[in-house]
């Protein structure tokens, strides 16, 4: 599977040496991605960060699909890891929170505040969903009032 993702990068070229350094960096990122345990929240965040680094260095339109094939994961799972990692920079992440809480909050404008509250009060997924519903109801009340 790795051949599909990296074959085009290994072809001999007359490119400047910088290209080789980029290939080496890409290979290093790919090797790290292959070693991740996606059952761990930290590793899911890391997968998203690695996907972003690869996307910046090799902006191919089908990069995530090819990477998903190489890693034998669903492309949606890879895209989700990328989006959640971009929505929650390392300084905003809280130890001990399940991935689902980050996933639920990834689009919310107050996601960093909500993650802090969830961590501080040991909220589970159901409690986070109730908080979101309460905040939405409050906003609707203000708009109607």
Annotate the PLM regions.
Residues 1-71, 116-119:
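N-terminal acidic-hydrophobic amphipathic loop/helix motif that frequently occurs adjacent to catalytic
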